[in-house]
Amino acid sequence: MSIRCGDTLLFQTLPVIAAGAAVGGKKEGEGPLAAEFDELSADNRFGQSSWEAAETYLQLRAARLCLQKAALPQEKVQLALAGDLQAQCTASSYAMRELGVPFAGLFGACSTMAEGLALGAASVSYTHLRAHET
């Protein structure tokens, strides 16, 4: 359970990030953070026929890498929070459908990452506290 202090949520049990993964294209590979990516491709379309398909591949590949690093089978995922800048979270929807996990699409433009972290933390906190009731 969280306590609200103004616009801030304070969690009694701190949420954790068990794993993360990042996949990037040519520009990311040329940048100063290239070594931080799990996978880079010189082909900005990752062998896909369109930008939309490439964005779907990016999300799917990053999700699979993250699950692998966390040693978590996809069947154990109860909810995925994901977003992209395509109309109605197209890439996210296709990637999560292929992964076969429950999905909530986020569209906040530049705030999507922060939105996902906040919603994820609140969801984990609530679920953790209610677990004793089942």
Residue locations for each model-derived region?
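Conserved small/polar residues in nucleotide/adenosyl-binding loops
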Residues: 127-134
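Cysteine-centered functional microenvironments
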Residues: 104-110, 114-117
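Acidic, glycine-rich active-site loops and adjacent beta-strand->loop/helix elements
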Residues: 83-88, 110-111, 133
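Conserved "HGTGT" condensation-loop signature of ketosynthase/thiolase-family condensing enzymes
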Residues: 1-104
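Secondary-structure boundary motif
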Residues: 72, 122-126
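Buried hydrophobic packing segments
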Residues: 62-66, 116-123
